[in-house]
């Protein structure tokens, strides 16, 4: 089972939530508050000290764009063609500043 850890707001996790929902994967939306975030940070549970993170059977993935790409691959949303795949990456990276 996958477990997406983020605050109870759309923010940097909403596109990930959509991709995970489209993937058909078994996943949990684990909302945390500020106190839980601080506790996870102090415990070293957040690889870069930030959320969102996606906890997988293979380990934890940090950084929203990396998680979105992972979820997109699970959902079959990432093109196999190298050019089209790069265009998808371009879109994801272009959305980051927003």
Residues covered by each model-derived region:
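GST-like domain detector, emphasizing the conserved glutathione-binding G-site
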Residues: 1-98
């Amino acid at each position: 089972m996958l477990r997406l850890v983020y605050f109870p707001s759309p923010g940097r996790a909403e596109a990930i939530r959509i991709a995970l929902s489209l993937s058909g994967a078994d996943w949990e939306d684990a909302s945390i508050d500020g106190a839980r975030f601080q506790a996870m940070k102090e415990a070293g549970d957040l690889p870069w000290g930030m959320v969102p993170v996606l906890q997988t059977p293979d380990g934890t993935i940090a950084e929203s764009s990396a998680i979105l790409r992972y979820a997109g691959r699970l959902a079959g949303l990432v093109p196999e063609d190298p050019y089209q795949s790069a265009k998808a990456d371009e879109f994801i990276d272009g959305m980051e500043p927003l």
